[in-house]
Curated annotation (Swiss-Prot):
<keyword id="KW-0611">Plant defense</keyword>
<comment type="similarity">
    <text>Belongs to the DEFL family.</text>
</comment>
<dbReference type="Pfam" id="PF07333">
    <property type="entry name" value="SLR1-BP"/>
</dbReference>
<keyword id="KW-0964">Secreted</keyword>
<keyword id="KW-0929">Antimicrobial</keyword>
<feature type="disulfide bond">
    <location>
        <begin position="55"/>
        <end position="77"/>
    </location>
</feature>
<feature type="disulfide bond">
    <location>
        <begin position="46"/>
        <end position="65"/>
    </location>
</feature>
<feature type="signal peptide">
    <location>
        <begin position="1"/>
        <end position="28"/>
    </location>
</feature>
<keyword id="KW-0732">Signal</keyword>
<dbReference type="GO" id="GO:0031640">
    <property type="term" value="P:killing of cells of another organism"/>
</dbReference>
<dbReference type="InterPro" id="IPR010851">
    <property type="entry name" value="DEFL"/>
</dbReference>
<keyword id="KW-1015">Disulfide bond</keyword>
<keyword id="KW-0295">Fungicide</keyword>
<dbReference type="GO" id="GO:0005576">
    <property type="term" value="C:extracellular region"/>
</dbReference>
<feature type="disulfide bond">
    <location>
        <begin position="37"/>
        <end position="81"/>
    </location>
</feature>
<feature type="disulfide bond">
    <location>
        <begin position="51"/>
        <end position="75"/>
    </location>
</feature>
<dbReference type="GO" id="GO:0050832">
    <property type="term" value="P:defense response to fungus"/>
</dbReference>
Length: 84
């Protein structure tokens, strides 16, 4: 499976299992558990074929919360957070 397909599969899976402690995504409006997400991704980390969604997922293994933004039309993600 190509890396991009793995990412989309993971996003689909995490959306289905978000109530079971998986990663949850929000666009624009942070959830209550995301208020203290300060770790920022830099522009260089979000390259054209690896936009903020996949970039944030790869970095999430470090724990905590990640705030990410990429202004390209297909690459808009503001917050990711691991729910406890």
């Amino acid at each position: 499976m190509e890396p991009s397909n793995q990412i989309f599969f993971y996003l689909r899976r995490s959306k289905l299992l978000s109530g079971l402690g998986e990663i949850r995504m929000a666009k624009g409006q942070p959830l209550g558990t995301m208020e203290r997400c300060y770790d920022m991704l830099t522009w260089g980390e979000c390259v054209p074929d690896n936009c903020a969604f996949s970039c944030a997922l790869k970095r999430h293994g470090k724990g905590g919360c990640i705030k990410a933004y990429d202004n390209r039309p297909a690459c808009v993600c503001y917050y990711t957070c691991l729910r406890s």
